[in-house]
Structure formats: structure tokens, C-alpha cells
Amino acid sequence: ERVQKAETTSENMELSEAETRYLIDEQLRKYGWEADTNNIRYSKGTRPQKGKNFAIAEWPTDSKVSKNGYADYALFVGLQLVGIVEAKKANIDIPSVIDYQCKDYAQLIKPEHNEYVIKQWGSYKVPFVFATNGRKYLKQIETKSGIWFLDLRNNSNAPKALQGWISPQGIMELLEKDISSANATLQNTPFDLLRDPDGLNLREYQIRAIEA
């Protein structure tokens, strides 16, 4: 009964994927992304630009999962590919979209787009993926509401629901945390281990950079 009530009060409408994307456009813009499904799209010539935070619609990948491999949005901070977003209809289980679709897109970035890849985490060329139906998060219908997010940089991470989108600045702060964590690990590693051929086997100039 509680689930039925939540479903009827949540926007009280069934949106198509196209309608969902218009809703997501508006949400992304509120968080600092430049988003416009009709105009900021790959097929109309939009490409990443320095100083721009683009959510580029219909970004092509080599995925064979669905829609000829087009991700609904690719998120760029300047020239850096930082996220993939999938939009779904209201009756779709959102976390499952991350598992079977978003992950596939994040692995199968086209070779000609590698210039936008920050780095690779295992088989993933994109750090963050999102899936949503545009509906506000409701605990009663948890898997069919909210913005679901997965940080692909660590295999132990699981999808989780967010109350809102992450801004371009927030994305860069998340990426910086990853860098800071790696640097902290190096800073706390004994220099003998850094030099050890059976350890990290770093060169002297690399060790000096860590000491600096």
C-alpha cells in the first residue's frame, strides 16, 4: 500500500525516455552543467571545450548493449571525460541500468575519444556513472527513483542513490580526493621500499618529487 501511494504521488506521471531527458537537462543546468538534449549533442557537432562544462547528449561508444552504443549524456569538465549518464523511463529499475549499461559504456569509449580520458581504472575509462528517471528520490520506491551513482575507480564500490546531481566542481573535488589518497600513500611509504626492485622500484627523480 505504501509503495502504491508513493508511486501515485511521485510526479503522478509516466515519462518517456525523451521526456525524462528534458527533465534531466533542467536538473543538470541547475548544478552548473551546460545541457540541452536538442542542441548540445554529438550529432550536431558539439565537442568538449576548454572552460566549458558540457553534458553532451547521444555520445557514441563501442558498446553493443543498446541504442547503437549511444550514451544519453557524457559529462565533460573542459576536455576531461568525467561521467556517463543514462536516462530511463519511470518503471525501470535504475541500479540495474548502471550494471548492464553504464559500466559497458564506461569500458567501451571509442579509441578516437581517448584524448578525453583522464586515466583508466581497471577496464573503465570513465570515473563516474549515473542513471536516473528524473524522479525525486523516495525511499518507498528506492530503486525506481532518484539519481543513482557509481564511482568506478574502486571495484568494491556499490551504486548508491543521490538526492541531487554533482556539480562540475564537486566532480573535480572527488577526482582530487583520489589523487590525494594516492599521494598520501606514497608519502607514507618508506623510501627503501620505493627504491626496492621488488617494491615500487621508482627512479631517483621520482622519489625526489615525492620528497618535495
Task: Describe the residue ranges of each PLM region.
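ATP-dependent helicase/translocase motor core
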Residues: 1-212
